[in-house]
């Protein structure tokens, strides 16, 4: 796999893309075993077609970070924070929605998220000095997913159609697995019954859908587990994100406080 931003130039034989290493937590095995043939075709379309038709095109994030978010166990998820697609500028996207690596300038969308957190929780004295959100995922259970996992440099939404079906299934998979866990726990003698009563839904997981693309995924989740807001991009943040209480709603649904600091 490539370890540079010039990732498409380092794939010597596109036919071998199905042999690249994808690291994910074991709790995602069922999903990836089901999807791997289709994922291989998606990656071939991205790297073969774009390299052939657009000689100098760059794809973000780097190929070894495309599935980075899935290194988190599904059992640890408290919040699915769903955005649109990766940052389409150089040295920004790192495989976690809205996040950037330390040393990278904080993008406007993430800056608005930080601004909103400071607005909602002034007593917590949050001080956001960088855009590395790894602690949110590792310690707070925030699953930082985009509806599209890749993007062409300078072209937002350029791969949204390619990833739509897969990320639909990701949302369904999370919801089904979390429901099934509680359902099976409460119905040990009837594990073959596929009918899940809504009263058994695990409400300790919240889907925060930011923007129109993310909100299209609402059909795969019970409404009691959903919070929606506009995307924090400067183009839409003032129309239903900034000045709201979206993160308070998340904590209220969870029944616990989230430490949104990044340290």
Give each language-model segment a name.
Residues 2-20, 184-204:
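Compositionally biased, intrinsically disordered low-complexity segments enriched
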Residues 26-184, 202-206, 213-219, 225, ...:
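A polyanion-binding, active-site-adjacent surface
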Residues 247-263:
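C-terminal functional extensions of proteins
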Residues 239, 243:
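Helix-centered, glycine/charged polyanion-binding patches within enzymatic domains
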């Amino acid at each position: 796999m490539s370890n540079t931003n010039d990732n498409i130039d380092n794939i010597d034989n596109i036919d071998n893309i199905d042999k690249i290493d994808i690291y994910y937590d074991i709790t995602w095995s069922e999903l990836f075993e089901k999807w791997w043939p289709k994922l291989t075709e998606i990656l071939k379309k991205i790297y073969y077609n774009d390299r052939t038709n657009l000689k100098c095109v760059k794809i973000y994030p780097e190929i070894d970070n495309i599935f980075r978010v899935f290194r988190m166990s599904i059992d640890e998820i408290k919040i699915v924070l769903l955005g649109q697609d990766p940052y389409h500028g150089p040295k920004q996207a790192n495989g976690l929605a809205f996040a950037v690596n330390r040393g990278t300038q904080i993008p406007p969308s993430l800056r608005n998220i930080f601004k909103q957190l400071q607005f909602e929780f002034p007593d917590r004295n949050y001080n956001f000095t960088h855009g590395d959100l790894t602690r949110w995922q590792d310690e707070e259970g925030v699953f930082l997913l985009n509806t599209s996992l890749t993007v062409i440099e300078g072209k937002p939404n350029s791969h949204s159609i390619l990833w739509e079906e897969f990320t639909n299934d990701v949302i369904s998979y999370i919801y089904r697995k979390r429901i099934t866990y509680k359902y099976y726990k409460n119905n040990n003698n009837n594990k073959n019954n596929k009918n899940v009563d809504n009263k058994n839904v695990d409400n300790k997981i919240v889907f925060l859908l930011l923007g129109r693309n993310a909100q299209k995924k609402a059909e795969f989740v019970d409404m009691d587990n959903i919070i929606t807001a506009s995307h924090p991009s400067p183009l839409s943040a003032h129309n239903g994100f900034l000045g709201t209480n979206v993160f308070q709603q998340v904590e209220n649904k969870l029944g616990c406080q989230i430490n949104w600091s990044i340290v």
